[in-house]
């Protein structure tokens, strides 16, 4: 038994080491990192599934386009700068029949990472190679001629990108210089310009030099501190996730983005400094392909100085009056939001100063005054009673309606005459519900509207007087049980006014009340309502496939837990395939036909 346990531990350790081979070559100070987990992906699909898919066929088509006889004129350079010509004929290979036969090890993890300095940012792609010569044979004829053979690596230099590889790894890097840096350090950098060299070509030349040095250092030197030892990144990777996104500090990333614009383009942002302008720190996301649903889970950490405000605004449960105000089983789609209006208004001045004061530091004092005046003028409690912060928009149905529109007719003398015509339009039937504890005030407002002939009131139902040319549907309103209703259905409005609301309200009650925001759509039901006579062949095929295979989609944002706000996007299917990744490939195949 001990030997078995020891063997299992050894295998587990080996697997972990293999998975972290490339991670140990990625610096710990990267700002954004996306990792594709090959082990989890190939538990879901086979290489042959990719080869047979529309995506795989396109990849193979491109690979075979370059897969012909060619002559390589390569230069081998040593540390002593000795050069010798090495010319050899490469025989024509057989047609590539699988994406696994392109030299890249597709069953090893792949990584994209973004790193930056104050002068330049780098987009990096790192993968493992299975066969260097095979990989090189897949390059275009032009790129094959650009290969430079160095001691320990091979390199192709493009205009702003560099490819470097050896027998084991391939690194692709694209450098993007900061205009802001060149503006700030113009006097010093201008001394490096060559004769008759203009701004764009100068920036490209300098940026290319920086990029090459960065690439050679990254590829050839051992990374002292790698992302493999970063506990936050390692913790962000969830079990069974096919891919993981990790952002070190979103707020600081956006700050640096503003700074990179430069004072010449965005003078207001010139002095942003090193402030986290949005108060959002670490962001992580994980992608899952399960049997009957595909999911993206996202976690967002809020900075300590923003946590207090966010918690007061978002930690509110939606009123049951709203949750129980529609039939959960019949809704085609709905969007809900629940925030504390009173607390939002109270926190607004401080948030205004922290967020926009950081973006526009030159106007920080003005921001503070605006915030103070806002607090002085606004009665947060009164507005919080008028609009509680609970809102629900429900799509009930779609219908065909004849609507008027204006066009022009020309007589024999080419004089224009306005003509009113009618056409059939596909319009939504919806209900908007807004929480309010000021029923009397709202009814007074509608009475005033009736006095000025803007609305009609009958049986406690308010009908807005609108031109059919402005909106293609009628609009009705009812105030009942601390809820303001706006609906396109007169029948629905009368039912609400009479209190005849025997709805099924169990299906989504927990989902809505446990989250600050929810967007739900019954994909199948919505698609069955949409006419397809004007759709293209591919659109009809996409619609047919979706109707046959999808159930519903949900996007939700949780209330704050600690200093974290979590969200989830989930697409549920009918489970017709082994997993949703296979279903995704089938969908692409169907649309691509």
Identify the residue ranges that each predicted region occupies.
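Bacterial Sec-dependent N-terminal signal peptides
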Residues: 1-26, 560, 564-565, 573-581, ...
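Structural boundary/hinge residues at secondary-structure and domain interfaces
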Residues: 20-143, 151, 225-416, 588-593
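Broad, structure-driven detector of short, well-ordered beta-strand segments within folded domains
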Residues: 161-166, 273-291, 390-396, 400-402, ...
């Amino acid at each position: 038994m001990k030997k078995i346990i020891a063997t299992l531990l050894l295998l587990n350790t080996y697997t972990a080491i293999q998975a972290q081979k490339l991670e140990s070559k990625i610096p710990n100070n990267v700002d954004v990192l996306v990792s594709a987990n090959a082990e989890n992906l190939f538990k879901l699909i086979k290489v042959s599934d990719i080869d047979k898919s529309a995506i795989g066929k396109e990849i193979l088509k491109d690979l075979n386009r370059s897969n012909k006889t060619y002559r390589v004129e390569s230069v081998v350079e040593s540390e002593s700068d000795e050069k010798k010509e090495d010319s050899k004929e490469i025989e024509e290979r057989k047609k590539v029949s699988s994406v696994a036969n392109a030299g890249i090890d597709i069953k090893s993890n792949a990584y994209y990472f973004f790193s930056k300095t104050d002068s330049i940012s780098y987009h990096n792609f790192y993968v493992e190679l299975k066969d260097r010569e095979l990989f090189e044979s897949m390059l275009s004829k032009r790129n094959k001629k650009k290969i430079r053979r160095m001691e320990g690596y091979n390199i192709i230099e493009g205009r702003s990108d560099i490819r470097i590889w050896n027998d084991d790894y391939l690194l692709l890097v694209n450098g993007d210089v900061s205009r802001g840096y060149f503006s700030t350090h113009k006097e010093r950098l201008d001394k490096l310009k060559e004769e008759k060299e203009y701004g764009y070509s100068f920036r490209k030349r300098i940026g290319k030099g920086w990029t090459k040095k960065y690439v050679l250092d990254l590829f050839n030197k051992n990374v002292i501190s790698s992302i493999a030892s970063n506990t936050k990144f390692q913790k962000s990777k969830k079990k069974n996730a096919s891919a993981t996104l990790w952002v070190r500090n979103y707020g600081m990333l956006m700050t640096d983005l503003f700074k990179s614009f430069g004072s010449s383009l965005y003078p207001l942002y010139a002095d942003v400094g090193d402030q986290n302008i949005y108060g959002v720190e670490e962001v992580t996301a994980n992608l899952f392909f399960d049997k009957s649903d595909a999911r993206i889970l996202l976690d967002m950490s809020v900075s300590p100085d923003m946590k207090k405000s966010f918690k007061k605004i978002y930690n509110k449960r939606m009123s049951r009056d709203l949750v129980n105000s529609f039939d959960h089983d019949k809704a085609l789609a709905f969007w809900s939001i629940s925030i504390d209006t009173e607390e939002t208004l109270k926190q607004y001045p401080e948030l205004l100063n922290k967020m926009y004061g950081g973006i526009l530091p030159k106007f920080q004092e003005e921001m503070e005054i605006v915030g103070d005046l806002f607090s002085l003028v606004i009665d947060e409690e009164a507005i919080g009673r008028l609009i509680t912060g609970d809102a629900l928009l429900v799509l009930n149905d779609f219908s065909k309606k004849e609507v008027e529109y204006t066009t022009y007719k020309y007589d024999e003398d080419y004089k224009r005459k306005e003509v009113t015509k009618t056409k059939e339009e596909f319009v939504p039937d919806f209900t908007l519900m807004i929480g309010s504890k000021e029923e009397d005030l709202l009814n007074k407002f509608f009475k005033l509207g009736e006095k000025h002939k803007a609305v009609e009131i009958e049986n406690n139902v308010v009908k807005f007087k609108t031109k059919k040319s402005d909106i293609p549907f009628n609009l009705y309103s009812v105030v009942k049980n601390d809820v303001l209703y706006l609906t396109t259905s007169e029948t629905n409005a009368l039912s609400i006014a009479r209190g005849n609301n025997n709805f099924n309200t169990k299906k989504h009650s927990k989902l809505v009340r446990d989250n600050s925001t929810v967007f739900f759509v019954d994909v199948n039901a919505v698609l069955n309502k949409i006419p397809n006579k004007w759709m293209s062949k591919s659109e009809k095929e996409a619609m047919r496939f979706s109707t046959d295979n999808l159930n519903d989609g949900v996007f939700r944002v949780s209330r704050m837990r600690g200093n974290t706000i979590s969200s989830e996007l989930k697409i549920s299917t009918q489970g017709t395939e082994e997993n949703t990744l296979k279903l995704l490939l089938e969908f692409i195949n169907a649309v691509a036909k």
